[in-house]
Amino acid sequence: MRIGVLTGGGDCPGLNAVIRAVVRKGSVDFDDEFVGFLDAWDGVLEKKFIELTVGTMRGMLPRGGTIIGTRRGSPFDHADGPQRVRNVCDELGLDGFVVIGGNGSLSVAAELHAQIGLPVVGVPKTIDNDIVGTDVCFGFNTAVQI
């Protein structure tokens, strides 16, 4: 499979570690390929991405932030946004997305799945710890302890 990865919403600790884990597990165990979209959904709409490999993930654990950038926003901010997402998936041969984000990013991912059938896996991330169905989201403990 070829999978798009993006981090949406605000920055928080642990994003690079999650990206690294997704890429390593998928690449090593399932021979998947990964594309990291720069600055969340904006990167998808503008087709700005980098290839993510086990090699590019080396040294990521101690680095803060996210190597692919993050931003708030939605393809639904544009009349043709959902269709542009579908077109990018088709052009790049993407089978689905891993979306790492909070309520906004995960809601967008769910709506894209509903409207255009985009397969998505959501990774809950928020310093607010307000995502239904989770006990503690990564990013929260560091936010309240610092």
What are the language-model segments listed below?
Residues 1-3, 29-33, 62-65, 92-96, ...:
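Short coil/turn connectors at secondary-structure junctions
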Residues 31-35, 113-137, 144:
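Short, acidic/small-residue loops that bind anionic groups at enzyme active sites
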Residues 25, 59, 88, 111-112:
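Hydrophobic/aromatic ligand-binding patch that stacks against planar heteroaromatic rings
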Residues 44-99, 104-105, 123, 127, ...:
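Glycine-rich oxoanion-binding loops at beta->alpha junctions
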Residues 9-13, 100-107:
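Gly/Ser/Thr-rich loops at beta-strand to alpha-helix junctions
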Residues 15-16, 46, 108-110, 132:
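Short glycine-/acidic-enriched loop or helix-start segments at secondary-structure transitions
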Residues 1-45:
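N-terminal phosphate-binding or glycine-rich loops at protein starts, especially the Walker A/P-loop
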Residues 17-22, 103-118:
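Short Gly/Thr/Asp-enriched flexible loops that form oxyanion-binding sites at enzyme active sites
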